[in-house]
A protein has these predicted regions:
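Sec-dependent bacterial lipoprotein signal peptides
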Residues: 1-19
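Cross-family detector of peptidyl-prolyl cis-trans isomerase
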Residues: 19-205
Length: 205
């Protein structure tokens, strides 16, 4: 009977020791993962700080231009203002705008003619995060310079075309018009009907 008790106790001791070793073996993995996350966060903080320093330098170099710091993490200045209107685009509207994209040295990456007129269903389409928030500040016919960090443009991946990794950008945006989706649909139907009538007239003539 004593032998059985000793055997059971020995097996239990081995099992307990094995569990402790397994737990100890897993700890470095958790520590390693936590360390990696901390390093990643630190790198991102340094990256953002560096880009914000670049933007601050641009603002200092343009002392005559009044830049405003937004609550969304970007800076902007007015080229053309509209003080008569109070409405701005909101979710459920369609914004019609033009824009061009430059680097912080003012070199054109995408020209307005290259990008063409833009039609944006507010907060329902996947566009640059900075633009998404910036457009909602604008009144009709306003033109604004936006300074964006890469975190709210194309980030680490760029756009896989002309914009590389972690590039802060200057975007110059003109809001031509905006309207509700219902009004936009009506306008598109009216244009479609008008085009169809013109084609029929040309065929008859």
């Amino acid at each position: 009977m004593k032998k059985i008790i000793y055997t059971i106790a020995f097996v239990f001791l081995l099992a307990n020791t094995s569990c402790q070793k397994n737990q100890e073996a897993r700890k470095p993995i958790a520590n390693s993962s936590g360390s990696f996350m901390k390093q990643s966060v630190d790198r991102n903080k340094k990256l953002i700080a560096g880009e914000e320093a670049e933007i601050a330098r641009v603002i200092r170099q343009n002392k005559r231009v009044k830049f405003i710091a937004s609550t969304k993490g970007f800076w902007y200045s007015y080229i053309a203002t509209n003080t008569k209107d109070t409405l701005t685009p909101k979710k459920g509207d369609v914004a019609l705008f033009d824009y061009e994209v430059k680097d912080l040295k003012g070199r054109i990456i995408y020209s307005q003619s290259e990008l063409g007129p833009q039609t944006y269903f507010v907060d329902k389409q996947n566009i640059m995060m900075g633009l998404r928030d910036g457009i909602k500040l604008m009144h009709r016919n306003e033109k604004i310079n936006f300074l964006f960090t890469s975190a709210i443009t194309y980030g680490y991946h760029g756009d896989n075309k002309k914009i590389g990794t972690n590039k802060p950008l200057l975007c110059i945006v003109t809001l031509r018009d905006f309207m509700s989706e219902a009004n936009y649909d009506q306008k598109m139907k009216a244009n479609s009907t008008s085009d169809s009538t013109t084609q029929n007239d040309s065929i008859i003539n």
